[in-house]
Amino acid sequence: MGFGDFLSKRMQKSIEKNMKNSTLNEENIKETLKEIRLSLLEADVNIEAAKEIINNVKQKALGGYISEGASAHQQMIKIVHEELVNILGKENAPLDINKKPSVVMMVGLQGSGKTTTANKLAYLLNKKNKKKVLLVGLDIYRPGAIEQLVQLGQKTNTQVFEKGKQDPVKTAEQALEYAKENNFDVVILDTAGRLQVDQVLMKELDNLKKKTSPNEILLVVDGMSGQEIINVTNEFNDKLKLSGVVVTKLDGDARGGATLSISYLTKLPIKFIGEGEGYNALAAFYPKRMADRLMGMGDIETLFERAVENIDERSIQKTMNRMFLGQFDLEDLRNQLAQIAKMGSLNKLMKMLPINKVSESQIQEAQRKLAVFSILMDSMTLKERRDPRVLKAISRKNRIIKGSGRSEKEFNELINSFEKGKKQVLEITKMIKSGRMPNLSKGGFKF
């Protein structure tokens, strides 16, 4: 459970418990803020940032910051949400990459995820911004660092410029010349890290800054490092004048609340967050969207963006047409599940929806079933997926069960879920064609 889940559930529970069937008054405000403060501190939010949030919420709640007709519960959520946005940085801070080639200098301590983040950023800029990106390996000290970058670049089809153990400053200068000659839009410098900040590291980074004049200097910090990331950020910023911060591993631990404090304490924007190991698990940071998640409002904007980026519109339209014609089969289901999987895990997608009634265990069980169903369908021939009626043959059924390594019970569950879902879709289609409004809450495929 990531820090967002931990903090979100604690704050929502506190507000709901103290504000249910009530109006805002000094007593329930005091009790709610006491519990929210404890939630913030337990999530490792810096004490000064926590005080700022609590004091501002208290002033607004007691100072008549009330919308007519809204419940105490709605009011408190609105006020806390606004203060979270303010603490997180108010607005999204996009990269300054209009110059060609633009230089992005990645800095940070060893273990922060700097090298993998450099590759993720290259992938993001290429896919989303249509930029031609050159990765430059400059970490000549950590064994295998440059080789790691080369391998990562191969996975994302990103070219890597490296000169082995050559002086990093010289390599960076040569990389810039190469980028200009070969029409690259962005150059990402993967600099050396250290176990701790030292003068040797800072001198090398300062030389790189002077020679390459980067448009952006991004500090990569480990979101699981606690309050230490504030000190690290300040040390790097004092020496290099950072343009922003990238926080990694936000999905890894409940005590990641120091992230909430970075912008407030350092006045630097969080530009990106890493929420997984995949090379597509880096996202631009939007304070409002993070606050939405923390307050249980979901994150529809990010969900929509992921859908646009990963789902083939023509394929969806084709599937919808087949559904309305009653021709939907297991091949269609398999294809749609594969497209949804590109958007991320079911757990992450569900958290982007403004719903609170689905428990963590229910989501995990649904995720498990989807994985099992996909394995079973992968073990079928195209003919079997296109015409599920042939699966009634015992020999086919046994072959699929054996080939997939799943059980007969799981096979039957897939077929029953599919048949039930298909029947419900047909009923909905008939109602639409006859001009009646279907009850969509009863339709669809149940997992």
Swiss-Prot record:
**What job does the chain carry out?**
Involved in targeting and insertion of nascent membrane proteins into the cytoplasmic membrane. Binds to the hydrophobic signal sequence of the ribosome-nascent chain (RNC) as it emerges from the ribosomes. The SRP-RNC complex is then targeted to the cytoplasmic membrane where it interacts with the SRP receptor FtsY.
User: Hey, which family's this protein in?
Assistant: Belongs to the GTP-binding SRP family. SRP54 subfamily.
Lineage top rank: taxon: Bacteria
Q: List the disulfide bonds.
A: none
GO biological process per UniProt: SRP-dependent cotranslational protein targeting to membrane
Native organism is Mycoplasma mycoides
Record text on subunit structure and interactions = Part of the signal recognition particle protein translocation system, which is composed of SRP and FtsY. Interacts with RNA.
A molecular function GO annotation:
ATP hydrolysis activity
Report the protein name in the record.
Signal recognition particle protein
